[in-house]
Amino acid sequence: MITRSDFDKLLRNQQYEELKSYKVENAVILAAGLSKRFLPISEYCPKGLTKVKGEILIERQIRQLQEAGIKEIYVVVGYKKELFFYLKDKFNVIIVENNEYDTKDNIESLNLVKKILGNTYICSVDNYYIDNPFRLYEYKGYYSSIYVEGYTDEWCINTDNTGTIQSVNIGGHDADIMMGYVYFDRVFSKQFKALLSKIPDDSEYWHQVWEYLYIHNLDKLHLEIKRHEPELILEFDSVNDVIKFDKSFLKNN
């Protein structure tokens, strides 16, 4: 493995032949959930298909990935799945159906696409990126993060002096929190798939977000932190969250 400074230099000089093993292969957008906290809108329209600032949420994310050069995009759907099918023709994405979206959490969505996990972006349909954060070459696996002052009930990241995540706590003060997309490199994906394949059918892991498997296996699953400015990554958990950003949201949906 080359050093990070060598990676950055090769990237600046556009020496892409030397960076083949660092090229992003694909992306997965997780869009299967019920979005219960997005009621009443989600009763008739999944969160990812709502219009924010004039753009359909999932379409904006697909465009950003494609503009970065990532052409192989998997969209995992479940709740009102048929409403997402048009994306296949419009954007040439691959639709994966999660028919257990109402009994299992998003770890099942990753289980359905585990064969294609390699150098892979893992994206959530409820994020909105002010600027395009994606790129075609990445040095190492990471979890995106923003810094929050004061108390937060989000997942708080602790790192060593190299930026590698050492522990994750739910809730904290003045902390870097998990927020936004994740990048799995091939090493991480290999370990993650091995752990995924060993989960028993009756395990509680199937009823948790995939990050629980990650934080319980930090000795095997290594990701760095990737810090972003707080105003550049938005997460829409509720209708009120969107209205704060887009005053016309209810009128347009």
Named regions from a protein language model:
Residues 3-43, 222:
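N-terminal nucleotide-binding beta1-loop-alpha1 segment
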Residues 25, 71, 118:
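Short acidic/polar active-site loop segments enriched in Thr and Asp
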Residues 55-72:
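A short, N-terminal amphipathic alpha-helix
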Residues 80-82:
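A conserved acidic beta->alpha catalytic loop
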Residues 85-155:
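Conserved beta-loop-beta/alpha segment of the NTase-like Rossmann-fold superfamily
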Residues 130-204:
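Conserved core of the sugar-phosphate nucleotidyltransferase
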Residues 215-227:
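Catalytic donor-sugar/metal-binding loop of nucleotide-sugar-dependent glycosyltransferases
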Residues 224-228, 234-237:
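Conserved active-site beta-strand element of glycosyltransferases/polysaccharide synthases
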